């Protein structure tokens, strides 16, 4: 929504500077994009946070995985593709094979039908579900409490929902906002390298992470393992793809979701 608003007003106030997160200025149907020089926008690399979660889940022993998103939009799809890539990397190390069901509910608000779908997945063998978008975390919290399954959420730290929510693949808004404001006030404006430009926030500046409660809720995937994995990804010792389309994943990864992908809507 903010991207649409900014698209319309960004040139109306020539003395106002804008900082936009998680979106870019676009028209209502996403057919046109335009960013004025007084606008700087930041897109998180959700696939990186998703990778951490997928790697942790499989290292912990969960190989029958699910992913439920509100809508099939780039940010949520990046969480899904990163989640699968991390799961694949951990499974390859351990000689395991993972399966992933994906489903996009086409709504931002959880309802009984969505919660029941997750309950059915758990009852049919899915061991861990990652949810992304809206308030799906409320639905998965109900589902794990009824079935004994496990979950990982996204965006914010939702581990207070209970021990069955093993962790959250988060965007570190506080760190990202502080860094951007420091850059702005140091120059007094968005300069030529920032004004009208897109910036990606991720491993490089520590602006995505996996949080897993206090005390740490993973057993096999230790905090030392997490720190090592994070550093290997930050320094590009390990590589990953920034896919925002499930249909363009590398073939070996796409094969694991080909038979399980759902795009039904409730």
Where in the sequence are the language-model features?
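A residue-level marker of the well-folded mature domains of exported/periplasmic proteins
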Residues: 1-266
